[in-house]
Protein backbone atom coordinates (compact mmCIF):
# COMPACT_ATOMS: atom_id res chain seq x y z
CA UNK A 1 0.00 0.00 0.00
CA UNK A 2 1.34 3.43 -0.91
CA UNK A 3 1.76 6.47 1.34
CA UNK A 4 -1.12 8.43 -0.23
CA UNK A 5 -3.69 5.78 0.72
CA UNK A 6 -2.09 5.02 4.08
CA UNK A 7 -2.21 8.71 5.07
CA UNK A 8 -5.81 9.12 3.86
CA UNK A 9 -7.25 6.20 5.82
CA UNK A 10 -5.40 7.14 9.02
CA UNK A 11 -7.66 10.17 9.47
CA UNK A 12 -10.81 8.21 10.21
CA UNK A 13 -14.35 9.43 9.52
CA UNK A 14 -13.77 8.63 5.85
CA UNK A 15 -16.04 9.76 3.03
CA UNK A 16 -15.58 7.57 -0.05
CA UNK A 17 -17.83 8.45 -3.00
CA UNK A 18 -18.34 6.12 -5.96
CA UNK A 19 -18.80 7.21 -9.59
CA UNK A 20 -18.76 5.20 -12.82
CA UNK A 21 -15.98 6.05 -15.27
CA UNK A 22 -17.37 7.59 -18.45
CA UNK A 23 -20.87 8.21 -17.08
CA UNK A 24 -22.15 9.90 -19.12
CA UNK A 25 -18.89 11.13 -20.75
CA UNK A 26 -15.21 11.13 -19.75
CA UNK A 27 -15.08 14.92 -19.28
CA UNK A 28 -17.93 14.71 -16.76
CA UNK A 29 -16.10 11.99 -14.80
CA UNK A 30 -13.02 14.21 -14.44
CA UNK A 31 -15.12 17.23 -13.38
CA UNK A 32 -17.10 15.12 -10.89
CA UNK A 33 -13.95 13.64 -9.34
CA UNK A 34 -12.60 17.14 -8.67
CA UNK A 35 -15.97 18.25 -7.33
CA UNK A 36 -16.10 15.30 -4.91
CA UNK A 37 -12.62 16.18 -3.69
CA UNK A 38 -13.87 19.74 -3.01
CA UNK A 39 -16.75 18.26 -1.00
CA UNK A 40 -14.27 16.52 1.26
CA UNK A 41 -13.88 13.05 -0.28
CA UNK A 42 -10.97 11.20 1.34
CA UNK A 43 -10.78 8.47 -1.31
CA UNK A 44 -12.48 8.19 -4.72
CA UNK A 45 -13.94 4.86 -5.81
CA UNK A 46 -13.96 4.75 -9.62
CA UNK A 47 -16.24 2.09 -11.10
CA UNK A 48 -15.33 0.34 -14.33
CA UNK A 49 -18.50 -0.09 -16.42
CA UNK A 50 -19.39 -3.72 -17.03
CA UNK A 51 -22.19 -5.38 -18.99
CA UNK A 52 -23.11 -7.87 -16.25
CA UNK A 53 -22.66 -6.08 -12.90
CA UNK A 54 -24.02 -8.64 -10.43
CA UNK A 55 -23.29 -6.68 -7.24
CA UNK A 56 -24.95 -3.49 -8.49
CA UNK A 57 -28.51 -2.26 -8.27
CA UNK A 58 -30.41 -0.67 -11.17
CA UNK A 59 -28.96 2.83 -10.68
CA UNK A 60 -25.34 1.73 -11.14
CA UNK A 61 -26.33 -0.79 -13.82
CA UNK A 62 -27.81 2.11 -15.80
CA UNK A 63 -24.64 4.15 -15.24
CA UNK A 64 -22.63 1.24 -16.66
CA UNK A 65 -24.91 1.12 -19.71
CA UNK A 66 -24.47 4.86 -20.32
CA UNK A 67 -20.69 4.63 -20.00
CA UNK A 68 -20.42 1.53 -22.22
CA UNK A 69 -22.63 3.22 -24.84
CA UNK A 70 -20.09 6.05 -24.86
CA UNK A 71 -17.26 3.59 -25.56
CA UNK A 72 -15.73 3.41 -22.07
CA UNK A 73 -13.40 0.46 -21.40
CA UNK A 74 -11.16 -0.65 -18.55
CA UNK A 75 -8.08 0.79 -20.28
CA UNK A 76 -9.79 4.12 -21.02
CA UNK A 77 -11.17 4.34 -17.47
CA UNK A 78 -7.73 3.84 -15.96
CA UNK A 79 -6.32 6.49 -18.29
CA UNK A 80 -8.76 9.05 -16.80
CA UNK A 81 -6.84 8.99 -13.51
CA UNK A 82 -3.64 10.70 -14.76
CA UNK A 83 -5.90 13.34 -16.36
CA UNK A 84 -7.61 13.86 -12.99
CA UNK A 85 -4.20 14.12 -11.32
CA UNK A 86 -3.12 16.73 -13.87
CA UNK A 87 -6.26 18.76 -13.06
CA UNK A 88 -5.48 18.70 -9.33
CA UNK A 89 -6.87 15.44 -7.88
CA UNK A 90 -4.69 14.52 -4.90
CA UNK A 91 -6.85 11.98 -3.05
CA UNK A 92 -6.34 8.22 -3.50
CA UNK A 93 -8.27 6.45 -6.27
CA UNK A 94 -9.56 2.90 -5.83
CA UNK A 95 -10.72 1.14 -9.01
CA UNK A 96 -13.86 -1.01 -8.65
CA UNK A 97 -13.97 -3.67 -11.35
CA UNK A 98 -15.48 -7.09 -11.86
CA UNK A 99 -13.12 -10.03 -12.31
CA UNK A 100 -13.84 -10.76 -15.97
CA UNK A 101 -12.51 -7.47 -17.48
CA UNK A 102 -9.53 -7.77 -15.14
CA UNK A 103 -8.75 -11.32 -16.26
CA UNK A 104 -8.97 -10.25 -19.91
CA UNK A 105 -6.64 -7.32 -19.26
CA UNK A 106 -4.24 -9.47 -17.21
CA UNK A 107 -3.46 -9.09 -13.50
CA UNK A 108 0.21 -8.17 -13.98
CA UNK A 109 -0.46 -5.67 -16.78
CA UNK A 110 -3.32 -4.12 -14.81
CA UNK A 111 -1.24 -3.63 -11.66
CA UNK A 112 1.72 -2.17 -13.55
CA UNK A 113 -0.56 0.22 -15.48
CA UNK A 114 -2.47 1.20 -12.34
CA UNK A 115 0.77 2.07 -10.56
CA UNK A 116 2.01 4.12 -13.55
CA UNK A 117 -1.31 5.99 -13.72
CA UNK A 118 -1.47 7.04 -10.05
CA UNK A 119 -4.15 4.53 -9.00
CA UNK A 120 -3.87 3.45 -5.37
CA UNK A 121 -5.95 0.32 -5.01
CA UNK A 122 -8.40 -2.15 -6.41
CA UNK A 123 -11.71 -3.68 -5.36
CA UNK A 124 -13.10 -6.77 -7.14
CA UNK A 125 -16.56 -7.62 -5.75
CA UNK A 126 -16.94 -11.01 -7.48
CA UNK A 127 -13.46 -12.37 -6.72
CA UNK A 128 -13.83 -14.81 -3.81
CA UNK A 129 -11.45 -14.21 -0.92
CA UNK A 130 -10.13 -17.77 -1.30
CA UNK A 131 -9.12 -17.07 -4.93
CA UNK A 132 -7.55 -13.65 -4.42
CA UNK A 133 -3.96 -14.62 -3.62
CA UNK A 134 -2.53 -14.30 -7.17
CA UNK A 135 -4.01 -10.83 -7.61
CA UNK A 136 -2.98 -9.83 -4.08
CA UNK A 137 0.63 -10.74 -4.88
CA UNK A 138 0.62 -8.66 -8.09
CA UNK A 139 -0.92 -5.72 -6.20
CA UNK A 140 1.73 -5.99 -3.51
CA UNK A 141 4.55 -5.84 -6.08
CA UNK A 142 3.23 -2.48 -7.30
CA UNK A 143 2.26 -1.02 -3.91
CA UNK A 144 -1.47 -1.24 -4.68
CA UNK A 145 -3.98 -2.09 -1.97
CA UNK A 146 -6.36 -4.94 -2.77
CA UNK A 147 -9.43 -3.87 -0.82
CA UNK A 148 -11.40 -6.71 0.77
CA UNK A 149 -15.18 -6.87 0.93
CA UNK A 150 -16.80 -8.43 3.97
CA UNK A 151 -20.48 -9.28 4.40
CA UNK A 152 -22.40 -10.53 7.44
CA UNK A 153 -21.09 -14.08 7.80
CA UNK A 154 -19.41 -16.27 10.42
CA UNK A 155 -17.03 -14.68 12.90
CA UNK A 156 -14.30 -17.06 11.70
CA UNK A 157 -14.63 -15.92 8.08
CA UNK A 158 -14.72 -12.24 9.08
CA UNK A 159 -11.47 -12.80 11.01
CA UNK A 160 -9.85 -14.57 8.03
CA UNK A 161 -10.75 -11.75 5.60
CA UNK A 162 -9.80 -9.02 8.09
CA UNK A 163 -6.41 -10.60 8.76
CA UNK A 164 -5.38 -10.01 5.13
CA UNK A 165 -7.09 -6.63 4.70
CA UNK A 166 -5.13 -3.77 3.14
CA UNK A 167 -5.93 -0.07 3.18
CA UNK A 168 -9.41 -0.43 4.59
CA UNK A 169 -12.05 -3.12 4.88
CA UNK A 170 -15.26 -2.55 2.92
CA UNK A 171 -18.31 -3.80 4.83
CA UNK A 172 -21.57 -4.52 3.07
CA UNK A 173 -24.18 -2.76 5.18
CA UNK A 174 -27.34 -4.33 3.81
CA UNK A 175 -27.99 -7.70 2.27
CA UNK A 176 -28.31 -8.01 -1.49
CA UNK A 177 -27.24 -5.66 -4.26
CA UNK A 178 -26.22 -2.03 -3.92
CA UNK A 179 -28.76 0.75 -3.96
CA UNK A 180 -29.90 3.70 -1.88
CA UNK A 181 -32.00 2.29 0.96
CA UNK A 182 -34.25 4.13 3.36
CA UNK A 183 -33.38 1.91 6.31
CA UNK A 184 -30.30 -0.06 7.26
CA UNK A 185 -30.38 -3.79 7.88
CA UNK A 186 -31.26 -4.46 11.55
CA UNK A 187 -28.26 -6.74 12.09
CA UNK A 188 -25.72 -4.24 10.78
CA UNK A 189 -24.71 -2.99 14.23
CA UNK A 190 -23.88 -6.49 15.50
CA UNK A 191 -21.99 -7.25 12.28
CA UNK A 192 -19.91 -4.07 12.53
CA UNK A 193 -19.06 -4.90 16.13
CA UNK A 194 -17.62 -8.23 14.96
CA UNK A 195 -15.62 -6.46 12.23
CA UNK A 196 -14.29 -3.89 14.70
CA UNK A 197 -12.99 -6.66 16.95
CA UNK A 198 -11.34 -8.50 14.05
CA UNK A 199 -9.99 -5.79 11.75
CA UNK A 200 -6.42 -4.47 11.99
CA UNK A 201 -7.27 -1.71 9.46
CA UNK A 202 -10.03 0.94 9.33
CA UNK A 203 -13.37 -0.34 8.04
CA UNK A 204 -16.00 1.49 6.02
CA UNK A 205 -19.63 0.74 5.25
CA UNK A 206 -21.21 0.91 1.81
CA UNK A 207 -24.10 -0.50 -0.17
CA UNK A 208 -27.15 1.58 0.55
CA UNK A 209 -26.30 4.88 2.26
CA UNK A 210 -28.45 7.75 1.03
CA UNK A 211 -29.02 10.35 3.77
CA UNK A 212 -27.19 12.55 6.26
CA UNK A 213 -28.85 10.61 9.10
CA UNK A 214 -27.47 7.31 7.76
CA UNK A 215 -24.00 8.81 7.30
CA UNK A 216 -24.08 10.05 10.89
CA UNK A 217 -25.41 6.72 12.21
CA UNK A 218 -22.76 4.70 10.37
CA UNK A 219 -20.06 7.09 11.56
CA UNK A 220 -20.82 5.99 15.11
CA UNK A 221 -20.09 2.36 14.28
CA UNK A 222 -17.49 2.45 11.49
CA UNK A 223 -14.48 4.45 10.31
CA UNK A 224 -16.28 5.81 7.28
CA UNK A 225 -18.90 5.44 4.57
CA UNK A 226 -19.00 4.67 0.87
CA UNK A 227 -21.78 6.49 -0.99
CA UNK A 228 -22.48 5.24 -4.51
CA UNK A 229 -26.03 4.79 -5.77
CA UNK A 230 -27.31 8.02 -4.20
CA UNK A 231 -24.66 10.07 -6.06
CA UNK A 232 -24.89 8.09 -9.30
CA UNK A 233 -28.66 8.64 -9.32
CA UNK A 234 -28.05 12.42 -9.28
CA UNK A 235 -25.64 12.01 -12.20
CA UNK A 236 -28.29 10.05 -14.12
CA UNK A 237 -30.86 12.81 -13.57
CA UNK A 238 -28.46 15.33 -15.15
CA UNK A 239 -27.13 13.06 -17.86
CA UNK A 240 -27.87 15.36 -20.82
CA UNK A 241 -26.55 18.47 -19.06
CA UNK A 242 -23.32 16.65 -18.14
CA UNK A 243 -22.73 15.65 -21.75
CA UNK A 244 -22.68 19.27 -22.95
CA UNK A 245 -19.70 21.50 -22.18
CA UNK A 246 -21.89 24.61 -21.79
CA UNK A 247 -24.20 23.05 -19.17
CA UNK A 248 -21.72 20.71 -17.43
CA UNK A 249 -20.42 23.12 -14.77
CA UNK A 250 -23.92 23.92 -13.51
CA UNK A 251 -24.87 20.22 -13.37
CA UNK A 252 -21.66 19.39 -11.47
CA UNK A 253 -22.39 22.23 -9.03
CA UNK A 254 -25.89 20.84 -8.36
CA UNK A 255 -24.47 17.37 -7.69
CA UNK A 256 -21.86 18.93 -5.38
CA UNK A 257 -24.65 20.64 -3.41
CA UNK A 258 -26.47 17.31 -3.12
CA UNK A 259 -23.31 15.56 -1.87
CA UNK A 260 -22.77 18.33 0.69
CA UNK A 261 -26.34 17.74 1.96
CA UNK A 262 -25.39 14.11 2.71
CA UNK A 263 -22.36 15.19 4.71
CA UNK A 264 -23.74 18.15 6.65
CA UNK A 265 -27.03 18.65 8.54
CA UNK A 266 -29.65 20.86 6.93
CA UNK A 267 -29.43 24.41 8.32
CA UNK A 268 -32.12 25.32 10.84
CA UNK A 269 -33.50 28.83 10.74
Curated annotation (Swiss-Prot):
Pathway: Amino-acid biosynthesis; L-tryptophan biosynthesis; L-tryptophan from chorismate: step 5/5. Gene3D superfamilies: Aldolase class I (3.20.20.70). GO terms for molecular function: tryptophan synthase activity. The keyword Amino-acid biosynthesis applies. Its EC number is 4.2.1.20. It is an enzyme of class 4 (lyase). GO terms for cellular component: cytosol. The keyword Amino-acid biosynthesis applies. Keywords: Amino-acid biosynthesis, Aromatic amino acid biosynthesis, Lyase, Tryptophan biosynthesis. The active site is at 45 (proton acceptor), 56 (proton acceptor). It catalyses: (1S,2R)-1-C-(indol-3-yl)glycerol 3-phosphate + L-serine = D-glyceraldehyde 3-phosphate + L-tryptophan + H2O. PANTHER family: TRYPTOPHAN SYNTHASE ALPHA CHAIN, CHLOROPLASTIC, TRYPTOPHAN SYNTHASE, ALPHA CHAIN. Tetramer of two alpha and two beta chains. The alpha subunit is responsible for the aldol cleavage of indoleglycerol phosphate to indole and glyceraldehyde 3-phosphate. Belongs to the TrpA family. This is Tryptophan synthase alpha chain.
